[in-house]
Amino acid sequence: MPIRPDLQQLEKCIDDALRKNDFKPLKTLLQIDICEDVKIKCSKQFFHKVDNLICRELNKEDIHNVSAILVSVGRCGKNISVLGQAGLLTMIKQGLIQKMVAWFEKSKDIIQSQGNSKDEAVLNMIEDLVDLLLVIHDVSDEGKKQVVESFVPRICSLVIDSRVNICIQQEIIKKMNAMLDKMPQDARKILSNQEMLILMSSMGERILDAGDYDLQVGIVEALCRMTTEKQRQELAHQWFSMDFIAKAFKRIKDSEFETDCRIFLNLVNGMLGDKRRVFTFPCLSAFLDKYELQIPSDEKLEEFWIDFNLGSQTLSFYIAGDNDDHQWEAVTVPEEKVQIYSIEVRESKKLLTIILKNTVKISKREGKELLLYFDASLEITNVTQKIFGATKHRESIRKQGISVAKTSLHILFDASGSQILVPESQISPVGEELVSLKEKSKSPKEFAKPSKYIKNSDKGNRNNSQLEKTTPSKRKMSEASMIVSGADRYTMRSPVLFSNTSIPPRRRRIKPPLQMTSSAEKPSVSQTSENRVDNAASLKSRSSEGRHRRDNIDKHIKTAKCVENTENKNVEFPNQNFSELQDVIPDSQAAEKRDHTILPGVLDNICGNKIHSKWACWTPVTNIELCNNQRASTSSGDTLNQDIVINKKLTKQKSSSSISDHNSEGTGKVKYKKEQTDHIKIDKAEVEVCKKHNQQQNHPKYSGQKNTENAKQSDWPVESETTFKSVLLNKTIEESLIYRKKYILSKDVNTATCDKNPSASKNVQSHRKAEKELTSELNSWDSKQKKMREKSKGKEFTNVAESLISQINKRYKTKDDIKSTRKLKESLINSGFSNKPVVQLSKEKVQKKSYRKLKTTFVNVTSECPVNDVYNFNLNGADDPIIKLGIQEFQATAKEACADRSIRLVGPRNHDELKSSVKTKDKKIITNHQKKNLFSDTETEYRCDDSKTDISWLREPKSKPQLIDYSRNKNVKNHKSGKSRSSLEKGQPSSKMTPSKNITKKMDKTIPEGRIRLPRKATKTKKNYKDLSNSESECEQEFSHSFKENIPVKEENIHSRMKTVKLPKKQQKVFCAETEKELSKQWKNSSLLKDAIRDNCLDLSPRSLSGSPSSIEVTRCIEKITEKDFTQDYDCITKSISPYPKTSSLESLNSNSGVGGTIKSPKNNEKNFLCASESCSPIPRPLFLPRHTPTKSNTIVNRKKISSLVLTQETQNSNSYSDVSSYSSEERFMEIESPHINENYIQSKREESHLASSLSKSSEGREKTWFDMPCDATHVSGPTQHLSRKRIYIEDNLSNSNEVEMEEKGERRANLLPKKLCKIEDADHHIHKMSESVSSLSTNDFSIPWETWQNEFAGIEMTYETYERLNSEFKRRNNIRHKMLSYFTTQSWKTAQQHLRTMNHQSQDSRIKKLDKFQFIIIEELENFEKDSQSLKDLEKEFVDFWEKIFQKFSAYQKSEQQRLHLLKTSLAKSVFCNTDSEETVFTSEMCLMKEDMKVLQDRLLKDMLEEELLNVRRELMSVFMSHERNANV
């Protein structure tokens, strides 16, 4: 062999690395090519030097140096010569394989420390080590046996270790299979031991969770190579627990391994279902750039399988090689090699395009782009994203650059309910701009889309994305876009809502909920949408497509809903049609206030849920609000609720984008609001008109008149069906964009405020329920929408718009607001409107239960058909449709909203409205108190019937949130205390209305739509630490309105109220002080008066401060007590006494109604509402009536000073004092009185100055008393009582200006008390207040008329002057005594109640503490028990594992012992025992040799002796001859 000097330096390089730690020479040596005939001489110490160097570097974990050493030894191994012998053989004898085992173990430790992370250096090191093993394996049979015996078990253990990276496992399993392929037959016995059987079983389990198809194949191949076919039949059931898998494994044949293994692994992976980590899909064709890759030529290979490996994050498949035998060639595409990929549908095929970072060579073909075609039905998107990541998805990147289609699309509905897109440009030029804005907002909406939408439409998503990218303006009607049945809406996963197929099957359709956004939202929406687009980022492209679809859909849906609603008016959803039409109609609608009113509760909920993501915006058009704005707003609110629900989900998915969008929306809102103002004015007028219309429809009378009303509405409905249809079609898109934008703005505003609203979460839940119902309703709407579409005509729309404008102009003036409001109230009262239903509506809206039937709700609200529908107003438990009151109030609110919008109603009214808005919109911004506050949802008459959500959702979402918030209560408290509204605003905004003024404005807009309430909204709900249910609070407000109108006004109370109303905010406190002074003058005992005032304050404050009376539970208990006590008191008291409370309440109500809700003091407003609600509520309240009746009869006392009307009223009601069932009389009283509210108000105002101070005192006391009584009654009677409760609030506030100060004190005290205590205290206060007021009334009334004196005491001579003195003195003393007694009674009662409360509180606390302690102990012991149980389980497991290890070790020991004995026996037999045969042969052979040797020696001896004798003879002869010659010579 030739010797190359450069390669002779191998050992020297090893020495340098070992001694000098210099690996450069060694790495340089590796670059030299080595020929087979080159011989490298090394010393005997070379092996030890290599071992020491590798061990050192492994300990240092210097992977690169270890690889260099292993590569050098592996490459030069066959050329190394040690002392003239083969180097590897010599090193094997020196223990190379045993040393390599140690190297492998140390390398294994390094691998395990790396975890599953992929490290190229470690992977290369393991490959180099295994390559060296292969070199040694091929040297000799001895080397093969040692390598297999030592390394196969270790490699198997490394393969089944889940902590090792899959790539490493793939490499070593391949090398192990290469070893096993060359393994000699006798070496199989080595693999039949128990240890290998256990490892094989573990390898079988590893197949299930390998996560890579190549690894699975390698494991199956190893199992097949380590066992014979017969052994596999026996061991398969041990390896696989499931029989069908074991049988499939048995069917694998060595001759058909590739195909059989494919069948087996496809079965295994398919069986795993969602848990599988290898997804295999059949590929139709594969291309590398332009070159097609061929499927392996195998008859059994049915499909061109592509494997998506989640574990290794690779895509792999096999192709036919270019060699002659067409062997299989594996192609693997790892994630790190992919630059970008895309998935799209082309010609009913799904194309996966993978662009690689570098050019690759596959089967002699080079390329950089891999194209894989799949069947369109296969879902490969999610799997591909899991492997390559979503960031490399071209769709998300490409869509960012996609231009947004500016063409407005108009939606029509065909007979099947399919939505058809028509270029909006063909319908109205304005639509394009709106659509562009809308599309901008769509991107965020798209992100907001729930994932459920996204998944189902993945297939159509690509097509739709392409279509929508271009959004052809010439889109044909046959090209239906985004159609999904309502039932499928919420089950869909994918965001793609549209499918390009013409009228796709309904099961594939998705109809997004209607988007109820007012036109006022336009600008802000566009801005918001733009911001959202920015936030979209990489997802933008997808979202943009979805946005386009969704926006169009939203528009279409809005239109469709509106149209369908109109048609359904007489069918399923009598009331809803109109409202939705109104929502869809013109931008001129009262969008601003309604905007937020529509979504007040919904928006609050949305905000509370932080659903202000794009979804809220994409609700279909709310434009059709003209006719039934309230209803429309309700429907819109409901729709928004649906959207909100969806948004909620979306928001969760894409909270970041939604949040940023929300911020952008906030900014856009400001700009947008400016633009909205123009539309708002017009819209408000329209809203009012619609409200009136709706009110008529919704009146209790309307329930009976629904058919008649339908005829009336037919003006709207007919026009709406036709013109509205056309409007919807033409304007729907524009308005949907605008309204959506508005909605987004309002939503953002509400979100800011609603997040603070505690009831928001509840509303969200209700939204979800509503969604389910809505889906079913949508289906019915689809068919109806087609009819509407056919009827749509632009000309009819114009007519309708003109009529709307004319009606708007009539009611658009601010001065008309109050009157219209009063008229609405009166009409409501006359119609016998059921307060309870209205309250329920608002409540449900607040709770978002309306969501369950948002669309249906819309229909019901607008439609007038008396269908016995779940959503029918009449079904609320009252004959009167719930919507009536809300609608009327809504109309009034709209009017007020108009006035407020420009002027913000005069101080007192504004203040009232502000307060009401605080109640109504606890979560909304107070900036626009007047607008927002004109009407509160609480005014909708809940009758404590929270469960009745069917109607509440029908109504416009009331501007007021569901529950009174603590923050709201604080605000209310401020109002009561007589502080300026500014202070209230500060308080409320800080707590709930922290959002910007823009938000407040938006909220204001929404309020009108929701249902604008009259001064009722201004009513200050009494603060209660425990918020009433939505139904309760709303009932109170609404009932208070009607009551105010119906109750006669007492002059003195009116006077105080008028002052309160007229006085500026700052003057309220002064006014309160003045009233107190007057009282003190009238009551000559100032100290008693103060005490009484304090008491009253304490009594009244809790309720007045709490937006609602004390909690239901507490109040009911109170009611029982108070009713008994009060009833007794009334019985004992003369009729003259009872009239006072009623008169006062009536006066307060009249003053409120007369002022038109301008009451300035929020406190007074709430009280007045409560009082008014009791007497006025059209709904009978048996428990409550006895008190009402006395109140009515009280008007008799003031006959002289009160108008004849009042006399008539009192006379009418005088007999109902003790009649618990005086519902009819009370109702008549309200009916008679309501029309004359203004008249009463004027009379009371005139007579105000004439009222005696004593009368005023008594009236005030009565008001207080009445206030307390109604509150109790309200709770007692239930929902109805709740309604009246609000009115009670109103009356008290109006009647008692003095109580302003008193309530301030009371409020302070109430705030300090816990919820429960406060409620109890409230009840107590009411009770003793009633008794006190009753007694005061009795003293005031106790007087003998002059006529009676003359007739009955004719015998006593007395002048009239003397009579007056005696009478006055008697009254004075009576009053003083009464005050003293009442004070004593009050204090005693308070003391007793305080002690009782303390005792109860302490006992409860102690019990609760004990229970908590016991619970804590139980929980702790349970935890300890669980820990102990777990420890026992662990111990048992460890014991089992330990026993198995012991068994294994014992088995190994037994086997080694047997081998040892055998070896000893054999050695003994060979070494110890003698073998004569062998010795004999040796002896024989040796003897023969000896004989031969002896013979040779003998012969040699004889020869020597003969030669010696002959020599002697010769010598003697010579001597003889010589002697003879001498002699001769001689």
Swiss-Prot record:
GO biological process terms on file: apoptotic process; cell division; ectopic germ cell programmed cell death; female meiotic nuclear division; fertilization; male genitalia morphogenesis; male meiotic nuclear division; negative regulation of apoptotic process
Keyword Cell cycle: yes
Biased composition (Polar residues): 515-530, 695-713, 755-764, 988-998
Signal peptide extent: none
Comp. bias intervals (Basic and acidic residues): 439-461, 542-555
GO cellular component: condensed chromosome, centromeric region; lateral element; nucleus; synaptonemal complex
Post-translational modification comment from the UniProt entry: Phosphorylated.
Biased composition annotated in UniProt, kind: Basic residues: 970-979
Keywords from the UniProt entry: Cell cycle, Cell division, Chromosome, DNA-binding, Meiosis, Nucleus, Phosphoprotein
Residues annotated as transmembrane: none
Keyword Glycoprotein found: no
Record PTM Phosphoserine, positions in chain: 457, 465, 494, 519, 529, 538, 660, 664, 936, 1136, 1138, 1145, 1161, 1177, 1204, 1234, 1253, 1295, 1297
Pfam family for this entry, one: SYCP2_SLD
UniProt-annotated stretches for the region Disordered: 439-480, 496-555, 653-676, 693-717, 755-795, 962-1003
Cellular localization per UniProt: Nucleus; Chromosome
Principal subcellular localisation of the protein: nucleus
Phosphothreonine: modified positions: T471, T619, T938, T1189, T1339
Function (record text): Major component of the axial/lateral elements of synaptonemal complexes (SCS) during meiotic prophase. Plays a role in the assembly of synaptonemal complexes. Required for normal meiotic chromosome synapsis during oocyte and spermatocyte development and for normal male and female fertility. Required for insertion of SYCP3 into synaptonemal complexes. May be involved in the organization of chromatin by temporarily binding to DNA scaffold attachment regions. Requires SYCP3, but not SYCP1, in order to be incorporated into the axial/lateral elements.
Complex formation: Component of the lateral elements of synaptonemal complexes. Heterodimer with SYCP3. Interacts with SMC1A and SMC3. Interacts with TEX11.
Similarity-based family: Belongs to the SYCP2 family.
Name of the protein in its database record: Synaptonemal complex protein 2
Protein source organism: Homo sapiens (Human)
